[in-house]
Amino acid sequence: MSRILELPLLAATPENIAPFGELVGVDRGRPTSRTRFYDDAVELVEKPRFISDADTCLSVARVRPRALEVIWMERHFKHTQAFLPLNGQPYAVVVAPPGEAELPDLSAVRAFSFDGDCGFLMHLGTWHEFPFALAQPLDLVVILRNETNRNLDAIADGEAVGEDLQKRHIGKRFDVTLRITRRSAGA
């Protein structure tokens, strides 16, 4: 039987999400500027750094609540994937920092909660599981390279692999269950 590793759910803030990526949204600690058009009615938030050197896809996903257990973690080498909520529902993202190893560092895995008013843009190579809906179904825009979609069809030993993707089955690789807990860290 596999061991269980609990991941306390941390509130996503610009500071604690920084090793993994950036928050995307208004009032998230980013500088703003006004455009000289539209009588200053448009305020622009400094944009996060999105990277993609090829055909990029915007998909809309409906994520229904599921068990708060990490099955897969994946990373991308050629683009910075983003998740942008559409319907204001809270969600969680599980991440591990980028690194040279073929697998994520389980001691560095973190779970973050998002209030549904901001998105998340990952750093290049950040390990992650697909977002978890925390209450109602979550509608979100997923921005990624089309090559990644093709890589998801390249299965080797039950995992997806490609030039822009490593998708690893955490339970099989580590004999562990990563479980998100709703109690805060330090509680």
Where are these predicted regions, by residue range?
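Non-catalytic, conserved peripheral segments adjacent to functional cores
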Residues: 1-111, 149-187
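His/acidic/aromatic-lined binding-pocket segments of jelly-roll/cupin-type domains
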Residues: 81-84, 119-120, 131
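A short pocket-lining beta-strand/turn micro-motif at the edge of beta-sheets
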Residues: 110, 118, 136-139
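Conserved metal-binding segment of the jelly-roll/cupin
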Residues: 113-127
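A short beta-strand-loop micro-motif that forms or neighbors metal/cofactor-
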Residues: 126-159
